[in-house]
Amino acid sequence: MAKDLSNQIVGVCRFSYAGEGGFASATMEQWALEAMLYDPARMKQRFVLFEQICLPSLAAQTDQDFKLIALIADTMPYRWRRRLKDLMGPYPFLQVCTIEAAGPLNSTRRAFRRGWDRHSKFITGFRIDDDDAVACDYIAKTRAVADQLLKLGWADEDTPAAIAFHRGIYWNMNSQEKPYWELSEIGPLGLASAMVTHNDSLANVYRWNHRKIAANVRTWCDPNDVMFVRTLHGVNDSDRSIPPTAELMEITKAQTLMRDRFALQPIKTLAA
């Protein structure tokens, strides 16, 4: 009998999730965290980034057989929940998952399970932030690699395996003169990384800090193709900066690449 290697691709985006373990929540009381996350001005900006950067890149995927779970806390105000759920119409791959405040592994494990189709033996789970993008062939390439890892036995019921594409563009939205930088990271990022696991595994791509993934699980890396756009805009929840080894890109070339490989409109996004 042929071995069951059925594999489903599911992404999780923690959308202003008021849980434990986030960068913003490290030293904040829960009430203060929620006040900061749900501030109307901040939420409007997060939706602009989500709608102009993250979602268009996923809508342009050459392989549309995937789900994106937007993980939110049950404390999110109704107006923002409603706006997020309204996006499920134009973006059929999007699903909203509401969970009480919890740690990053517990909450994301439950989110991945919400996206599971209940019959695939394996889940290839990727992570993405609401202000980042992946190349239009990201899902297709991730599936091709994941299927090969399963066939080779490098990933199985007991052994997860990570897939990392770590060349991409850093987009400094605050700079008009030097906005675009290209870099092949020395190791996996959280962005454009995924993990192949059994459908009831306790592990997922959020289990370890991205800098430690290769030290804990088998990891397949590709530093060649430009596969992600990471944005810097002054209100990032994490402490982002342009890495010192990144190379400055010519503006027209970068904008063409972002349009062709990511379905992004940089000028329109900046005006939003």
Locations of the language-model features?
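C-terminal catalytic/acceptor-binding lobe
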Residues: 2-6, 12, 186-272
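Hydrophobic targeting segments
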Residues: 8-13, 57-58, 66-71
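A solvent-exposed, charged loop/short amphipathic helix patch at secondary-structure junctions
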Residues: 17-45
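Short, acidic, metal-binding catalytic loop of nucleotide-sugar glycosyltransferases
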Residues: 35, 53-65, 90-91
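A conserved acidic beta->alpha catalytic loop
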Residues: 35, 42, 72-80
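Conserved catalytic core of nucleotide-sugar-dependent glycosyltransferases
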Residues: 103-118, 133-218
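Short aromatic/hydrophobic "clamp" motif used to bind/position activated sugar donors
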Residues: 125-128
